[in-house]
């Protein structure tokens, strides 16, 4: 009796650059799971139709990337707690006529910081730069780690305040604008898009110290401008490649109930950058 290979994909626009198929192919081989994983380019005005067609063709799950995470959130028939907190979905699972929406970005970030970088979040001071979708997706998993302080800083103070109020009451959660930051933090996370424009958020170098881990959600072959700035002021730096691999591993677990090992996949991707 032959078994059907389960079908997954990453959906977005653009999508050709996505490393997700490579990551999931390695996870599948490692865990001996019978699946295929493709890239799916959806028209900017055709996300819903693309997902429906994927389901009709017996697709089992999707990773969702830019610019469709909010549409996926609205479309899901059931949401995980972390997806609800994020207000966005990066993982869809189709099962028994239901569409489960999840968000694995935050747990990917936390796993990379705590397990891979070996830096505890518990009891630490954490600065989160940015108040957009990338920041919103990681706040709940960071709070679950019980930091001493989690400060959301943004160019527009009111936007940081609006974001913090979604998680209120949280006595450890604070807001700031970039210019008001004057203390050193244990962990500084760049969730802005500044690195895409080869810029650095306008923050004081005093947020960095020798003990600081400066983490940029972006990644590339060379350190980002944020990482360069942080390193010049004494911080240890790390980019977001590990977050990419760890959020993929969490999606794989949501779909298959099997947790893959990530270290070898991370090393392979790093070597190819």
From Swiss-Prot:
The UniProt record lists the keyword Cell wall biogenesis/degradation: no
Keyword set includes Ion transport: no
Residues bound to NADP(+): 81, 130-134, 154-159, 217, 240
CDD domains: NAD_bind_Shikimate_DH (cd01065)
Pfam families in the cross-refs: SDH_C, Shikimate_DH, Shikimate_dh_N
Alphabetized InterPro entries for the sequence: Aminoacid_DH-like_N_sf (IPR046346), NAD(P)-bd_dom_sf (IPR036291), SDH_C (IPR041121), Shikimate_DH (IPR011342), Shikimate_DH-bd_N (IPR013708), Shikimate_DH_fam (IPR022893), Shikm_DH/Glu-tRNA_Rdtase (IPR006151)
PANTHER family, per database record: BIFUNCTIONAL 3-DEHYDROQUINATE DEHYDRATASE_SHIKIMATE DEHYDROGENASE, CHLOROPLASTIC, SHIKIMATE DEHYDROGENASE
Family per similarity comment: Belongs to the shikimate dehydrogenase family.
Oligomeric form and interacting partners: Homodimer.
The protein's name in its UniProt record: Shikimate dehydrogenase (NADP(+))
Gene symbol of the encoding locus: aroE
């Amino acid at each position: 009796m032959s078994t059907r290979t389960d079908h997954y994909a990453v959906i977005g626009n653009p999508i050709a650059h996505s490393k997700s198929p490579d990551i999931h192919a390695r996870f599948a081989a490692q865990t001996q799971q019978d699946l295929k994983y493709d890239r799916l380019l959806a028209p900017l005005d055709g996300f819903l139709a693309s997902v429906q067609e994927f389901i009709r063709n017996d697709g089992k799950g999707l990773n969702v990337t830019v610019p469709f995470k909010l549409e996926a959130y609205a479309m899901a028939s059931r949401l995980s707690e972390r997806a609800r907190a994020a207000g966005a979905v990066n993982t869809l699972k189709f099962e028994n006529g239901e569409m489960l929406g999840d968000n694995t970005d935050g747990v990917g970030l936390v796993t990379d910081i705590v397990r891979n970088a070996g830096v505890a979040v518990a009891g630490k001071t954490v600065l989160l730069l940015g108040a957009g979708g990338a920041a919103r997706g990681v706040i709940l998993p960071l709070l679950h780690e019980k930091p001493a302080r989690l400060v959301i800083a943004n160019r527009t103070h009111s936007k940081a305040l609006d974001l913090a109020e979604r998680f209120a009451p949280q006595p450890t959660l604070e807001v700031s604008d970039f210019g008001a930051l004057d203390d050193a933090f244990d962990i500084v996370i760049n969730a802005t898009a500044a690195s895409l424009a080869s810029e650095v958020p306008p923050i004081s170098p005093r947020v960095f110290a020798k003990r600081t881990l400066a983490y940029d959600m972006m990644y590339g072959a060379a350190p980002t401008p944020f990482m360069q700035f942080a390193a010049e002021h004494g911080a240890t730096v790390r980019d977001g490649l590990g977050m990419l691999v760890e959020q993929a591993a969490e999606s794989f677990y949501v779909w298959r109930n099997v947790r893959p090992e990530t270290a070898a996949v991370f090393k392979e991707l790093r070597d190819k950058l």
